[in-house]
A protein has these predicted regions:
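An N-terminal assembly and electron-transfer interface module characteristic of large anaerobic redox
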Residues: 1-173
């Protein structure tokens, strides 16, 4: 947009990590040439505290992930930073931006990744890998049989900014 039309813009994704959310707000207000509202600093501090409080609760917990409305690799980078261990990630694509988050995930663990979010064949992996949680789409019947707790983030399409961090932490904790 900037190069072609001279229009500045910010890619404001549904990030989970407080630092990335705060950076997006800073870029937005810089482009608008407006001061960053003070309440954003407070929300940022709240999100950092909420994330830190989640670490002892989530540390070591394993999960599978189906596709979500969130920025998938960023979400998993955030969750691994909290100490969670993804066993299998179902992700539809890998963009250039995702590469940094993929590398962050690999500093914590090396999960299986499948491009197809095909619940049919993947249902057989619940009793084998035994994840504590399934975040996003999945086979509810097989999860129940395997003792995997289903976590749905139904509000993901309706939130942005620090609300994403709040939703993620509340849904999983």
């Amino acid at each position: 947009m900037k190069r072609k039309f001279g229009t500045p813009y910010v890619v404001f994704e549904r990030y989970s990590d407080p630092n990335r959310i705060y950076q997006s707000y800073k870029e937005l207000f810089e482009i608008l040439e407006k001061p960053l509202p003070e309440k954003l600093v407070g929300w940022y501090q709240d999100a950092k505290e909420r994330s830190e409080a989640a670490k002892p609760i989530l540390g070591g917990k394993t999960y599978f992930s189906g596709n979500t409305a969130l920025c998938n690799y960023e979400l998993h980078s955030f969750l691994t930073g909290l100490g969670m261990k993804p066993l299998l990630l179902q992700i539809s694509d890998l963009t250039a931006q995702d590469e940094q988050w993929r590398k962050e995930i690999l500093t914590h663990c090396d999960p299986y990744v499948t491009r197809a979010a095909n619940i049919g064949p993947l249902q057989y992996l619940y009793p084998v890998l035994k994840p504590k949680f399934n975040i996003g789409a999945g086979n509810a019947k097989e999860m129940k049989t395997s003792g995997t707790q289903m976590i749905r983030m139904m509000q993901a399409y309706n939130v942005l900014g620090f609300e994403v961090n709040e939703m993620v932490c509340e849904c999983i904790c």
